[in-house]
Amino acid sequence: MAQTIYVLNGPNLNLLGTREPEIYGRATLADVEKLCAETAAGFGLIAVCRQSNHEGQLIDWIHQARSEKVAGLVINAGGYTHTSIALHDALVGVQIPTVEVHVSNVFAREDFRHHSFIAKAAFASLCGFGIDGYRLAITGLAAKLGASATA
């Protein structure tokens, strides 16, 4: 039976493709979700992609991941990255291998974006690769889970 991973996207990521395309590019959230599904399938994994503008909903999905025995998480917490101790605590609490991803290079932007509460709860962080960061995140997560590329 294929292992499931969750790909969680936080606030404003529903606006990908139209919000500040000079920073985030023109790819849409639908493009991200398609890329994630295809990449995961290449490792025999199932990617369940979700997006919410609400912190509590993201936390509920993280908790649900534990109860459903989800193998791993990829999370782009958007602006909550820099503010949410609650998301950090949820990730630490469920003890599921997690990769943090950001479309833009947060370290080349405003100072307030340079701190991540998510990073300390993740085994890896990626930023600045555009939506390809999701492919890289799933590839790294698959390696962590011992999943091999399928033919």
From Swiss-Prot:
E.C. designation(s): 4.2.1.10
Record flagged with keyword Lyase: yes
CDD domains attached to this UniProt entry: DHQase_II
Pathway where it operates: Metabolic intermediate biosynthesis; chorismate biosynthesis; chorismate from D-erythrose 4-phosphate and phosphoenolpyruvate: step 3/7
Xref: InterPro entries: DHquinase_II (IPR001874), DHquinase_II_CS (IPR018509), DHquinase_II_sf (IPR036441)
Molecular function as annotated in GO: 3-dehydroquinate dehydratase activity
Site feature Transition state stabilizer, where: 19
HAMAP family: AroQ
The protein's name: 3-dehydroquinate dehydratase
Organism: Rhodopseudomonas palustris (strain ATCC BAA-98 / CGA009)
